[in-house]
Amino acid sequence: ANPYFHIVDTQGNQLPYISEQDEIYANDNEVRILKLVNAEADYKSQSLQLPSAPILLENQQKGDYTIHLRPEITMANISFNVTSADLGKRKVFGDLRFRQAMSVAMNREEINEVAFFGQGTPKQYLAFSPTPGFVGKKWETYMIQYDPGMANRLLDEIGMKDTDGDGFRELPNGKKLVINMQFSTQGIAGQVVEMVGQNWSEVGIKTAVKEVTPDEYRSAQSSNQLDVGMWRSGQPLAIVLGNNELFVPPYEGYFGHRTGMLWAEYVDSNGSKGVKPPAYVIQLIEDINEFQSTKIGSPRFEELGERMVKNTVTNLLKIGVVQGPAPVYHRNALKNFVEFKTHSYEYYRTYPYRGTQWYFDE
């Protein structure tokens, strides 16, 4: 117990019952899963994703641990670097038709069946999660249909042609295009990234997939070096009411999914640095500020919320893939462990479940 901690239990015993916590860092997903199968951890939820569930479920009895599959608040989503230092890429990534093409080029049903075992829901990214009642359900399915024909037509319109006959499209300026898909398994499952990369290659967009550490990913993302951002995003209404980050460049903090870094510079410097964002970005900033100061449940509040979602969804700065459950792991010797309602950072993971009252029985 910690004598300086501010909570005691109902009998007056000082909390927490467990006086020390050690965290083992295992970046490689296979190593991480092996450690869990061998019961080398007492609790784990962060970085666990549904594609790893079968091996964890299969070894529960042998490892004397329990897996609960709980719904996620966030969802896998992808962004393009609309302020890329490569001006040829910046022009293409900033073209809404390109982002529309990349959205409909994804076979979300197949991704759900293969990577999520049919347990997820193909869905567009709305920023809000779960979807509030004042937001039209139609936005959840906006541009998520699998339509490679439409993707090819849009890419043709932009002027992205295969000029050298290698099966992949060049940029409109004639330069070769390779989209570097760096990802961390803390943010998105490798199977999802590989399948999305394959889908894009099928409409002539060459990709290179590489797994990196979370630190490498975040550093590259915040220094405007990524071609593509890939992480999990989404917040409940209650959080959005006090936190505007999903609607203001760069659309999340250092540890989340950021895009439009030079737009953020422009906004933060009042236009003295960075790149001026499009009008819809400024509109979103104005709307979230008014939304947060408007009476909850009023007609104006709901009008603003719907408009924010429409603006977010139709501009596809973050493109949703699939939302599904994820594993929560605990060793059976860890007692007072109640089943989580959600798998989420947004509710501070263990905080609602009184982790201070967990104890060991062994």
Feature annotation, model-predicted:
Residues 44-46, 161-165, 201-216:
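Short, well-structured beta-strand/strand-turn elements
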Residues 24-86, 109-114, 228, 232-234, ...:
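Extracellular/periplasmic solute-recognition and catalytic clefts
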Residues 37, 196-203:
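A short alpha-helix/helix-coil micro-patch that ends at or immediately precedes a cysteine
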